[in-house]
Amino acid sequence: MKVRASVKKICRNCKVVKRKGVIRVLCVEPKHKQRQG
């Protein structure tokens, strides 16, 4: 899980999801998981 100020989709499988006010990127590739913080 990468914690970044700006989260972006890295590949076409990435999805941007908002959970409890936190923006996250989910993907089939574990390296692409991110959250904003």
Curated annotation (Swiss-Prot):
| Disulphide bridges, residue numbers | none
Question: Pfam families of this UniProt entry?
Answer: Ribosomal_L36
GO MF terms listed in the record are: structural constituent of ribosome
Going by the entry's taxonomy, the superkingdom of the source organism is recorded as Bacteria
**InterPro entries in the record:** Ribosomal_bL36, Ribosomal_bL36_sp
Could you list this entry's UniProt keywords, alphabetically sorted: Ribonucleoprotein, Ribosomal protein
Q: Which Gene Ontology cellular component annotation is one that this UniProt entry carries?
A: ribonucleoprotein complex
Q: Which GO terms describe its biological process?
A: translation
Q: Which PANTHER family match?
A: 50S RIBOSOMAL PROTEIN L36, CHLOROPLASTIC, LARGE RIBOSOMAL SUBUNIT PROTEIN BL36C
Family under the similarity heading: Belongs to the bacterial ribosomal protein bL36 family.
Provide the protein name.
Large ribosomal subunit protein bL36
Gene name, Swiss-Prot/TrEMBL: rpmJ
